[in-house]
Amino acid sequence: PMQAHTNPWYLVLSSYWFASSFKWFLILLVLLPARVAELVPEAERATRLGLLFALGAVMALIGPPIWGYISDRVGRRMPFLVLGAVLTAGALLWMAYAGSYWQLVVAYLLLQIADDMATGPYSALIPDLTARRERGVASGWLGTLQVGGQVTAGAVGFLLANLQWQFLLIALLNLVAAGMVLSLIREVPGLKPQRRELWESLLAPWRSADFRWVWLTRFLVMLAQYMVQTYLQYYLADVVETFQAFGQTLATEAFQAVALLGLLISLGAAVSAVPAGRLSDQHGRKPIIYVAGVGLAVLMLPILLLPRYDVLIVLALVFGLLYGAYLAVDWALVSDVLPNPQAHATDMGIWQTSIVLPQVLAGSFGAMLDVFNRQSPGLGYTVLFLIAGMCFVLGTILVRQIRSAR
């Protein structure tokens, strides 16, 4: 095993998060839409894709807490990572070569189950293995690797035209990352198996007021983030319209323009995550969350008032820096307030729902957007981004209520 708690150790500890976010970025953005388009008539495309997304979202809500619970019951993490990673690779190959839409559905559901099996227990490793004074750094590395996975996936999606090769690459990366974690990280020896029943375990963390506040604040910030992210491409197409900066035309289509902004946000986040985590170990979690959250809220105004692509490029970078700091410190914050050391995987699985639920809910703002845009062009985006700004502010201010972290 590696020397614990050096930078390389943190890097390997979170390497499966790199593989996981690489996988989901390509699957949700590129591969699922493309495979559905190959397998169903054009008129049914959006409906069939929506069905897949909905099924996946429901499973992503219930899967991690349940696999986390099983992992806590057994008192082990790594066996789930191994089995989950192997099944993930199998499901990806099946998705790549599925001959019908329903085969694709089953393969995708298998992928969800396999992913939850691996990442539910895996998410307990930071609270399991790191002391409170180093969780900021550990979470910072996690944030950097998650974002790095997205950047790498974006590059691969851009450069590698063959869809089957993309699936194979994701499968390979999953196995390599799981192998790294397995060979170089030792899980907590003799973790006492959890004895509570499933319902009792799923309800237990909610009895802690701090856990409720951590869940709610994360939920609000993520809801704001996904409200912006989900409709940004349409905002670029409808309001910004031309994509010039520094005398150059950088993109001709809105989807290229949004990909570039996404890349800049990710780069900003990758830069800020580890330093922010380190600062939070020294000076406390809350000050950094206050700065990042208020900053994200304030950014909503220039996005609305100056709808020019060159301005958005700069704002995307700033957004990324703040968002990376928030992500890093938030994971450390929840690790600090988990009530029961024997239930880390269950509790982290429940906390993860505060990230999945906003993704699902963000889709429901589309109708409101259309209604307001019909009244006056662009009005919908103003309303949407202002609501997002309010969620950023609320999700930041309410962190004050968390008592057991500073």
Whereabouts are the PLM-identified features?
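Juxtamembrane intracellular "pre-TM" segments in multi-pass secondary transporters
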Residues: 1-7, 187-216, 242
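Helix-loop boundary and gating motifs at the non-cytosolic
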Residues: 2-56, 212-213, 217, 221-246
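Glycine-rich segments within core transmembrane alpha-helices of 12-TM secondary carriers
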Residues: 56-61, 136-158, 352-363
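A membrane-interface helix-boundary motif in multi-pass transporters
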Residues: 77-78, 159-173, 367-391
